[in-house]
Amino acid sequence: MSASSSDPFHSFAKTSFTSKAAKRATAHSLPPLPGPGDLPPGMNVEYDVAIVGSGPIGSTYARELVEAGFNVAMFEIGEIDSGLKIGSHKKNTVEYQKNIDKFVNVIQGQLMPVSVPVNTMVVDTLSPASWQASTFFVRNGANPEQDPLRNLSGQAVTRVVGGMSTHWTCATPRFEKLQRPLLVKNDPVADDAEWDRLYKKAESYFKTGTTQFAESIRHNLVLKKLQEEYKGVRDFQQIPLAATRQSPTFVEWSSAHTVFDLENRPNKDAPKQRFNLFPAVACTSVRRNDANSEIIGLDVRDLHGGKSITIKAKVYILTAGAVHNAQLLAASGFGQLGRPDPAKPLPSLLPYLGTHITEQTLVFCQTVMSTELINSVTADMTIVGKPGDPDYSVTYTSGSPNNKHPDWWNEKVKKHMMDHQEDPLPIPFEDPEPQVTTLFKASHPWHTQIHRDAFSYGAVQQSIDSRLIVDWRFFGRTEPKEENKLWFSDKITDAYNLPQPTFDFRFPGGREAEDMMTDMCVMSAKIGGFLPGSYPQFMEPGLVLHLGGTHRMGFDEKADKCCVDTDSRVFGFKNLFLGGCGNIPTAYAANPTLTAMSLAIKSCEYIKKNFEPSPNPVKHHN
């Protein structure tokens, strides 16, 4: 069908039609509370705290508040799919730690794109008898309102219990001061101290460390070479990682489960605590009172049984991610629905919802370690004969002051060369991967990850030994701009019948991203040559999955153009809190999860001071 007035959908975008989700956002009547027999198993009508989302930020709120005696319910749109440890990292299996490239498929299977423009390619070879689309055809979850030139095409979400922490890299650096939002005004010393206090607690929850790869040959090859090449100019270290090394060959990667065991309580390990997790239960909106001063209900839908229920609580916390937090608010009458129109007045509730969003630029390449580096692995070895010959031997002098490598290194190399004489590489098969960084500084304002890990891209072809491969990922910051927006359709809904998210985003101009690319190219060349097919390149906008600023934090709603205060409380509402990277209002290049967790800890401290848990009858039982 041609794009003409004969097409009934030709001018659909200009009609007054609004979706059911948009109508619900402006509704004022409350549905009746369900009776006891109408609730899914284990669900009550009322709790002290209702949390939406089960990722590491939701788990932080749950841990802090459950341990303080609150009766907490957590609602997660996704399901439990991470094994016996609910919300655990899926890389915590021997299979994936032996072959990290296999984990790429796990990540790809978990990620759901946020906004996909309609493919305008015409299929002109269909049979004349086949139904053909109009110009406004919504197919396969595509978004007809998305401008492909202003999209974050790589942006995606994960809908499972544990969220993205079930497959993330576990990189948890602190924000350098230039990246951090202020928590204490006009007192830099006090602000530094507050951040240090919060970061320390968050690091303890995540089990962050910087020594898990200290006895990796590949890690030390890369680390020492870069330290040597940039001596006195740049500092290199292990990436701060949320992980615990269990053995020389196995690491337990942290996740939401590490922060808080998502098992229902009371149970045998926590007989006096109250917590319930409800997977496959979607939050559809929050209910405001007539005065718009507090939340009086949380609308949820059981995705298995199909029932819609309103839950009551003293405190409501949205931790469903930077996209879904804003989406739920827009579906509840906050901000505005529909394409932003500068001619219209700002909405009265959260006028800056979805404005000033940020996402990081990303440059990527892969290198194959140089012959010089590989030859240096055996610098302390005395090799007699040829592999496979009866007289073949590999020895070294333990503890010699002339050794270039420590004994643990030499012992691993010797054992591998003797046990696996068929292998031309002297690096043990199970040698841990490199995990190196040079952190964000004013002189080079980008974050770096020089490592070998699984992402939704960057798998290594089978013809190359992965022990030789080093991944280079450099992340750049983006200054918050009001014109960079995430908005929600009043006509189109997503797969869960919520207003469709749409991006209106462009990376600001400037030299910083190009300087970052140059830095990566120069630095990576010191380690080896580029892997064919993985030459230096800018990656899709949004592929970093570090979207921020969708519900910004600040001190004053109007002056700072923000949505929540420094306790993560929504302006004007005494009992609604938002958690996650959407709160971060600054230009940042580093991984934001640790910072978002720190803000959640501060938010919990406010909640514990201003709300009382209900009496716990379990406490009176022996």
From Swiss-Prot:
Q: Which cofactor does it need?
A: FAD
EC number, as in UniProt: 1.1.3.10
Phenotype upon changing E540K? In P2OxB1; increases thermostability up to 70 degrees Celsius and enhances pH stability in alkaline solution
Gene giving rise to this polypeptide: p2ox
Q: Name it.
A: Pyranose 2-oxidase
The secretion signal range is 1-28
Protein task: Catalyzes the oxidation of various aldopyranoses and disaccharides on carbon-2 to the corresponding 2-keto sugars concomitant with the reduction of O(2) to H(2)O(2). Plays an important role in lignin degradation of wood rot fungi by supplying the essential cosubstrate H(2)O(2) for the ligninolytic peroxidases, lignin peroxidase and manganese-dependent peroxidase. The preferred substrate is D-glucose which is converted to 2-dehydro-D-glucose, an intermediate of a secondary metabolic pathway leading to the antibiotic cortalcerone.
Query: Which portions of this protein are annotated as coiled-coil regions?
Result: none
Thermal dependence: Optimum temperature is 44 degrees Celsius. Active from 30 to 55 degrees Celsius. Thermostable for 30 minutes up to 50 degrees Celsius.
| UniProt binding sites for substrate | Q449, H451
- Cell compartments where the protein resides: Periplasm
As for PTM, the annotation reads:
Not glycosylated.
Organism name: Phlebiopsis gigantea (White-rot fungus)
Q: In terms of pH, how does activity behave?
A: Optimum pH is 4.5-6.0. Active from pH 4 to 7.5. Stable from pH 4 to 11.
